[in-house]
Amino acid sequence: MKKVIFFSILPIMLVLSACFNDPIQDDLMDYVNKEMLTAFELEATAVSAYDQVSGLNYSDDITMYDALVSTVIPTYNEFIKELNSVPIETSELREIHEIYIKGADLQYNAFVKIVRALETQDPLLIEEANGMLEEARSLLREYQNEIDKLAEEHNVDWEEKDSSTSSI
């Protein structure tokens, strides 16, 4: 008799446990804690290399050119490949991830345009690249805002590892 009761209650328990499982929460946790680690590292390396030769750290065109060609662009290209290969299970997270890819692609193209501008000494190309960087920053902020909103909606709390921000 106990077996009959147990086996008749078991399917109900399994259905109830499935109700408590949030696939978006699971996908988001996996995304941040596992799938994006390599991408985050590659992005940090590329952006740090760019930050070291731009803005207040700018010294001359040759130094910037060398950093872009030898480190920033190749590393950022690997970052974009990694972004494109991240497995994502839910459409909600996929839509947000696509914003990240769009911003990263735009930033990569801006870096390439800066190299062309330095090679040709064309100030108009620099202006175009700076506009592209600004638009990329906007997309990357949108990504961050949307990922934060999704996390909040699905009860995911972030633990900040590094509070430094890029100047890009």
Residue ranges and their predicted role:
Residues 1-4:
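Positively charged n-region of N-terminal signal peptides that target proteins for export
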Residues 28-104, 111, 116-118, 123-167:
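Alpha-helical segments in soluble extracytoplasmic regions
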Residues 15-18:
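C-terminal motif of bacterial Sec signal peptides marking the signal peptidase cleavage site
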Residues 20-22:
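Bacterial signal peptide processing site
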